[in-house]
Amino acid sequence: MANVALLGCTGMVGSHILTHLLGNSSVARIDTISRRTPQPATAAPQEKLTTFVSDDSSKWASQLSSLTPTPDIFISAFGTTRGAAGGFENQYKIEHGLNVEMARAARDAGTKVYVLISSTGADKNSSFGYPRMKGEIEEEVKAMGFDRTIILRPGLISGERQESRPAEAVMRGFAGLVGKIHSGLKDGWAQDADVIAKAAVNAGVKALNGEVPAGSEKVWVMYGKDIIQYGKGQ
């Protein structure tokens, strides 16, 4: 039975991750750290869910470090947008800074498996800010030396977002339409948030049990086809 900590539990993918963790019989305890109370905790008491809610993100790492029992798996689906942050510089400080800080706190606490929801095209050498930020987060996390590091690189994430992203909403709508015709037409470039979430949970639990693909014993990077496999077929 796994103890899991989750960062980003109120976002598009993270909320689905929480739902799958709650429904997974291999998960004994879930700790979430967030600015807002996740919906499952507001709907009804959840026996295996403990929430820490604070607007002061400087307290998050110490909260993670103090969790008892220590999480076996730490999952980060945390991210923000340029608009919400007030520009890319602030987005970088928040998204890169908190992801790296929380990963380090998890490692130092003794967490064995780290799971990151990243993005297709993540590249620390990119000339574009967003993929460069994602790539830098990946590289810094990999260097921390968790027993297992899992990085999911989904394409366009389809589903319903709470915040407004008009251009992305058009593409999500198109992905949904194409997916209704045949799922294979969109699986290569867009994945449903729920499918990504299930893949993250399944991969994390399998990695904790030592069930990883050959050659991915330390770092397992999951692309679209892998996400579909573990999010739909497992």
Swiss-Prot record:
Pfam families named among the record's database cross-references: NAD_binding_10
GO BP term (any one): import into nucleus
Entry keyword Transit peptide: yes
Keywords tagged on the record: Membrane, Mitochondrion, Mitochondrion outer membrane, Transit peptide
Membrane topology of this protein: Peripheral membrane protein
Major subcellular location class: mitochondrion
Protein name stated in the entry: Protein fmp52, mitochondrial
Origin species: Aspergillus niger (strain ATCC MYA-4892 / CBS 513.88 / FGSC A1513)
